[in-house]
Structure formats: structure tokens, C-alpha cells
């Protein structure tokens, strides 16, 4: 599952769980982007976003977090993400889960022509968001029917944008994201106007504990 995860919230986790159940996936790998090339806003430090994702997914043995995008130099392109994941899992069939709104702009993605050769795409959307195949016309209209699946996830009514705004306004984040992520956001003073404390996170390692 690719995304900025700035911050990760229950919508992401429910979407991952639902898609895993729908397609019978053995595991879901969350891949926080390193340097998102399409974002027109400031994005939190990659290590903060990575650690929040680790915290959020730690209790689910089917979930894991990859650093392939964070550790790769330069802007994050989905093509490179999928190639790296293929190299790490050469015998696995890949399903790339991303927001349906991102799929709407797929023709502007770097190397989009090769993306559907690398993975089956699953676009997850919030309730009421309409994305028809006609929105991604042209060559993509010739894709096999099983190349792209759109799934509506009610929990995606929660958004990272709203979570950031609530944090900036000192409003509660409880029940929008896992408790550990709420505490991390508070401790690191993320999304606040004033700079946060000088806390080094580059070498931080979290113990996720043993899974049942």
C-alpha cells in the first residue's frame, strides 16, 4: 500500500484490511513515500511518517512496513517502488493499493506505461467519491478488466488533511488513528505552527513486540 501517510489513520488501516480480505492477500506492505513528487505542500520528515506507520501496523501480523521509498534517493515514483518490491519478492503477485484520487491522475505518473505490467492496481475511495474508468481514458481504456479494481471504503471518510488540521488546532485525534500514533504526533509536535523539539529520529528503532 503506497502513500504519504502524513499521518497514517484508521482509514488507511481499514482499507488495507478490506483489500487483503477481498483479494486473499497474504500480507500488506505499507510503503511510505520518500520524496512525493506530486505533493504541493510541505510533507513531514520521512522518518516521522515511517515510524508512525510502524506504530500503526505493529499489532497486525499481516501488515509490515517497507523502507524502499524512504531509503531511495530522489523523488518517489511508483514505477521504482514496484520494481524494488518485485526484486525483494520475485515470486509474489503484487497488488498496488492507492487512493482512487491518485489513480485519476495516473497518466501524469512517471513511467505509467509500465505500471500495469508490474502490479494489479486497487484504487480505494471514500464514500461518495466517483471514479469511472472513463476518467482514465486513452490507452488505459484498453487495459484488461482485471488490471484495475475500485473499492469504496467507508472509513476513508477520515482524511490525513483533517488529522493535520485538527493537530494544528489542538483538537483531539483519538479514535481517528491508533493511540500510539496520537501520542507520537503529540510528542513530536507534528503539524503545529511552531517548530517541534530537537529530537533525533534517524536512528530510532521501535520494538513491535511478538505477534500472537
UniProtKB/Swiss-Prot annotation:
It comes from the Bacteria. Its EC number is 2.7.7.18. The keyword ATP-binding applies. Pathway: Cofactor biosynthesis; NAD(+) biosynthesis; deamido-NAD(+) from nicotinate D-ribonucleotide: step 1/1. CDD domains: NMNAT. SUPFAM superfamilies: Nucleotidylyl transferase. GO terms for molecular function: ATP binding; nicotinate-nucleotide adenylyltransferase activity. It catalyses: nicotinate beta-D-ribonucleotide + ATP + H(+) = deamido-NAD(+) + diphosphate. It holds the Pfam family CTP_transf_like. GO terms for biological process: NAD biosynthetic process. Keywords: ATP-binding, NAD, Nucleotide-binding, Nucleotidyltransferase, Pyridine nucleotide biosynthesis, Transferase. Belongs to the NadD family. Catalyzes the reversible adenylation of nicotinate mononucleotide (NaMN) to nicotinic acid adenine dinucleotide (NaAD). NCBIfam families: cyt_tran_rel, nicotinate (nicotinamide) nucleotide adenylyltransferase, PRK00071.1-3. This is Probable nicotinate-nucleotide adenylyltransferase.
